[in-house]
């Protein structure tokens, strides 16, 4: 496929900054470009419905992976979870085209690989190489796209198991895959996921490291592109790129052109306090 790839961080229902970003001369002038979204298209911001409609209308120019807030929307629509006070999903749930939007969303991938870049919402476990990540993501994708997708969503909540075993089955297997791809931030050096600690980057207790610094990570030979971690903010290394720059918290919405790492950002209005996921 021709054209540049612009990868965009967590939008979280902030449609005005998204429109401004896509209209930026550097991006709008790149007429053959394609767009990768690193998940969390919806929630916490005021315009989740408009965001979904806009990105859905981009058609084949857009690749969006599922984030934890996107999965939460699916669960709320399915009746598996009730929206919380901080959620801003009612407009989507009550929309006349809700069925179409939900069907589009549940057919999004959990991982995407192209041109040496692996995009996920949150991260990958150290034992997983690209092929295994895509295969395991595919297991969950198949469940979400099938006729029993509502039942599949019932299995995804919980922090355990926190480590991967090839012989995990059923709900345990699905939870580990979803938690790694959409929720992970910190791990022990042996790769045990840790969800209780929520502190500023660099202030985490001894014995915890960011998932991407777990020793011998099997994806270190490619570049993993992710969002999810607004307090970490913009991070660009040869092996990892974090693009969650806290749009909904009053930070910025960021887009990065992958082939030359050209960065474009637009400032965002603060809609909520940065005290959630």
UniProtKB/Swiss-Prot annotation:
Family: Belongs to the Ap4A hydrolase family.
Keyword Hydrolase: yes
Xref: CDD domains: MPP_ApaH
UniProt keyword annotations, A-Z: Hydrolase
EC class (word): hydrolase
Species of provenance: Bordetella parapertussis (strain 12822 / ATCC BAA-587 / NCTC 13253)
Gene Ontology terms, MF aspect: bis(5'-nucleosyl)-tetraphosphatase (symmetrical) activity
Gene3D superfamilies attached to this UniProt entry: 3.60.21.10
Top-rank lineage group of the source organism: Bacteria
Gene that this sequence comes from: apaH
Catalytic activity of the protein: P(1),P(4)-bis(5'-adenosyl) tetraphosphate + H2O = 2 ADP + 2 H(+)
Protein name: Bis(5'-nucleosyl)-tetraphosphatase, symmetrical
Purpose of the protein: Hydrolyzes diadenosine 5',5'''-P1,P4-tetraphosphate to yield ADP.
Record flagged with keyword Transcription: no
Enzyme Commission number, as recorded: 3.6.1.41
């Amino acid at each position: 496929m021709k054209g540049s790839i612009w990868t965009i961080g967590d939008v979280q229902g902030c449609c005005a900054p998204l429109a401004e970003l896509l209209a930026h001369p550097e991006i709008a002038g790149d007429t053959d470009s394609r767009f990768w979204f690193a998940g969390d298209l919806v929630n916490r911001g005021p315009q989740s419905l408009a965001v979904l409609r806009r990105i859905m209308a981009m058609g084949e120019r857009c690749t969006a992976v599922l984030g934890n807030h996107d999965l939460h929307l699916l669960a709320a629509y399915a009746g598996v979870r009730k929206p919380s006070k901080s959620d801003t999903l009612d407009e989507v749930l009550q929309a006349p085209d809700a069925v179409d939007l939900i069907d589009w969303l549940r057919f999004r991938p959990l991982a995407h690989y192209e041109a040496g870049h692996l995009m996920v919402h949150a991260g990958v476990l150290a034992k997983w190489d690209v092929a295994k990540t895509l295969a395991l993501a595919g297991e969950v994708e198949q469940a979400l796209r099938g006729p029993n997708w509502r039942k599949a969503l019932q299995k995804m909540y919980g922090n355990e198991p926190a480590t991967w075993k090839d012989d995990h089955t059923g709900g345990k297997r699905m939870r580990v895959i979803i938690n790694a791809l959409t929720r992970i931030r910190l791990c022990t050096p042996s790769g045990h996921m840790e969800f209780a600690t929520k502190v500023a980057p660099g202030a985490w207790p001894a014995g915890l490291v960011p998932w991407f610094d777990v020793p011998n990570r099997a994806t270190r030979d490619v570049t993993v592109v992710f969002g999810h971690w607004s307090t970490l903010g913009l991070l660009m290394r040869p092996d990892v790129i974090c693009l969650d720059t806290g749009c909904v918290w009053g930070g910025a919405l960021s887009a990065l052109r992958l082939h030359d790492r050209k960065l474009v950002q637009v400032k965002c209005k603060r809609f909520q306090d940065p005290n959630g996921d």
